[in-house]
Amino acid sequence: MELLHVLGNTWAAVAATALLPVYKLTDRDVVLIDTGYAKLDRAGLTSLIDANGWRLRAILCSHAHFDHTGNVRYLQQRYGAPAAISLIEAGISVNPDSYRANYVALTYGKSREIFLEECFTADRVIFPQDDHIDIDGARFGVLSLPGHSAGHIGFVTPDGAAYVGDCLIDQHEIDAAKLPTSMFIAKDLDSKAALRATDYPAYILAHKQIVTDRAELSALIDSNIAFI
């Protein structure tokens, strides 16, 4: 799994369909944001961690979709790393029946069949009023970005790089998609528009771009809003 430098101690692991931010607390201690697909990304993610001799200190989760939380429980068990996610998404993540809340078109039987790997129990819950979370003395900002899912959040690394999860997707993803994935359209539109008022040196889109130019970010926000 390739590792891209974003800025400072912030990196992004290139998973099968997403960028997974990695923040280096030290040369060996890291925080991972989102975990990719269970089947597609587990081997590569494990190899990346082990080959670099990293100690996984925490997992931060943007939301409970299978391409983001597919390896949380596995990483909790393998490395003893605590996982944090927003209150709403923590409840959704507990078991396949509750996970279905983010995939309402699926039957209960189908959700139990395909979502066993994606379910986990959060070690820390991020509440709606929380604007940060501290990991080993490093402060990560929390961005409230609901809409794509009910409790979707983003994170700002101590370097100031903003991970916006699925609040925005890149132009290639927009062009390739048949329909937008938005659970609450009005909130999603508000969250996308709210990013205009932010000013970070880098924005990491899970799917699948790093943006450092303000004009490019503005154009991408326009495209995402138009797509909805």
Role assignments for model-derived ranges:
Residues 37, 42-43, 47-132:
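Active-site HxH/HxHxD metal-binding segment of metal-dependent hydrolases
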Residues 2-8, 110-115, 135-138:
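Short Pro/Gly-enriched beta-strand edge/turn motifs at strand-loop
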Residues 12-13, 123-124, 144-146:
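Short Gly/Pro-enriched turn/cap motifs at secondary-structure boundaries
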Residues 31, 60, 83, 161-164, ...:
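Residue-level marker for buried hydrophobic side chains located in beta-strands
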Residues 37-38, 139-146, 150-217, 224:
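Metallo-beta-lactamase
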Residues 31-34, 58-61, 142-144:
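Short catalytic-loop micro-motif centered on adjacent basic/acidic residues
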Residues 1-52, 154-165:
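Conserved beta-strand hairpin/beta-sheet module of binuclear metal-dependent hydrolase folds
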Residues 135, 222-228:
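Charged, glycine-enriched surface loops/patches
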